[in-house]
Amino acid sequence: MKLINKYANSRYSKMNEYYCGITTELDKLAGLDPNGHWKHYVFCDYEDGCLPIRIPGGTLGSIEYDENKIITKIHVCTDYVVKTYPDDVNEQLQKFIGQKIEMGD
């Protein structure tokens, strides 16, 4: 799973905010406009084995990974900020477990 810098080639690129397959999936599951500005993203610093899942307004979940950057756990809080997730959103995200996190171009 590639992390793509949310602000690539701009003065904001060092903010460490990234899109990925999980954030795209969450946008779809929540019914967000794919061309809108209000989208899910992850904050990446690779310090503690966890990437926070964010949306403007708050942190609503996490992607946990091991020392090889393999995803081991994903969880999204369904009663905070975004109220439009399907009931099984966390189950649907489990398909990403086992994927390797890589930095994109």
Give the ranges of each region predicted by the language model.
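Compositionally biased, intrinsically disordered low-complexity regions
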Residues: 7-10, 82, 95
